[in-house]
Amino acid sequence: MIDSKSGTSGGGREPNQKLLLSECGEGLSAYGLINHRHTSEIEQIASSISGNNIELLFTPHLIPISRGMLSTIYGRLRDPGLTSDDCRILLDNFYRNFNNIKVLPVDTY
């Protein structure tokens, strides 16, 4: 399950009334709940990386910021013996060359 929040810049460059600050300011809304255009892409990449067929639920939300994204991803681990610190090390190693992704320390929110 992926719960993502993004700013209005994710809506593209075309003028859109629902992306105006007067329309989306002080609120948030879910969109693209069924068959979001990025769901199949995320499933394909996750399946390729894991070596398993991954099916997921993706719920994007529009929040009143100009840019940025926060995603919380939930799932079951193949190895139930992994600790939070183990997972953090794995994520740090995987994303070490991605300057736009920041893996936060365990228990940081």
Predicted features, each with a name:
Residues D3-Y109:
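C-terminal substrate-binding/catalytic lobe of Rossmann-fold NAD(P)-dependent oxidoreductases
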